[in-house]
Regions:
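N-terminal beta1-alpha1 ligand-phosphate binding loop
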Residues: 31-53, 57
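Short hydrophobic segments within beta-strands
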Residues: 36-38, 66, 126
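Short, positively charged low-complexity motifs
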Residues: 1-6, 20
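Short glycine-rich anion-binding loops that position phosphate/pyrophosphate groups of nucleotides
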Residues: 41, 101-104, 129-132
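Structured adenosyl-cofactor binding patch, chiefly the S-adenosyl-L-methionine
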Residues: 135-179
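S-adenosyl-L-methionine/SAH cofactor-binding core of RNA-modifying enzymes
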Residues: 61-63, 67-124
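Short, surface-exposed alpha-helical segments at coil->helix boundaries
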Residues: 47-54, 80-83, 135
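Short, Lys/Arg-enriched N-terminal segments with co-localized hydrophobic residues
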Residues: 16-30
Length: 180
């Protein structure tokens, strides 16, 4: 079974998808944002969109996406196993933002401000598996963020998050990408 997928960025900020490999130290050194998600690699319909937005991100908004395999179990056992996989990718001083439909709603400018406020730390965005995450991982999270009251497929959440990170970067830069 595939251990995980990683999307590191080069020094220029351009991304590439590497299957089953560890990120290079030089790629990690420039990273400030990591998206950790559970599930399969990107479906054909989502890959171009995620790629488009992640490749446009520049430091300090540069991001990597780590796709961890989903559990072969169901229910509580799956939630526990997947949360442990996520925990193994976190550092004790990470600023953790968990995406969950029961979280707090943030506008795009609020997200941009939140990232900018914590950009001196490593920021980890977490997209849990189909059964969610454990209460321990929820408590480790600094913010629980809801994209909407609606529930979305995980593939779509990855795309929305990638676009929102790009939008946050552009709001921070003062560009005309975001119209409010």
């Amino acid at each position: 079974m595939q251990e995980w997928l990683n999307w590191p960025l080069s020094k220029s900020g351009m991304g590439q998808l590497i299957e089953g490999s560890n990120p290079s130290l030089s790629a990690i050194d420039i990273m400030k944002i990591t998206i950790i998600t559970i599930g399969k690699k990107h479906e054909a319909w989502v890959q171009p969109g995620v790629s488009r937005f992640l490749e446009r991100l520049r430091a300090p908004f540069a991001a990597e996406m780590i796709i961890l395999p989903h559990s072969s179990f169901e229910g509580d056992r799956a939630r526990q196993e997947e949360s442990e996989r996520i925990f193994s990718r976190l550092n004790s001083d990470d600023f953790v933002i968990l995406l969950d439909e029961r979280g707090k709603n943030l506008s795009s400018p609020e997200l941009s401000d939140l990232i900018t406020e914590h950009i001196d730390k490593h920021i980890a965005f977490i997209i849990g598996g189909a059964y969610g995450v454990t209460s321990d991982l929820r408590q480790k999270s600094n913010i629980v963020w809801s994209l909407s009251n609606l529930v979305f497929p995980h593939q779509l959440v990855r795309l929305i998050l990638a676009e929102q990170l790009y939008r946050a970067q552009e709001i921070h830069r003062g560009s005309h990408y975001h119209h409010s």
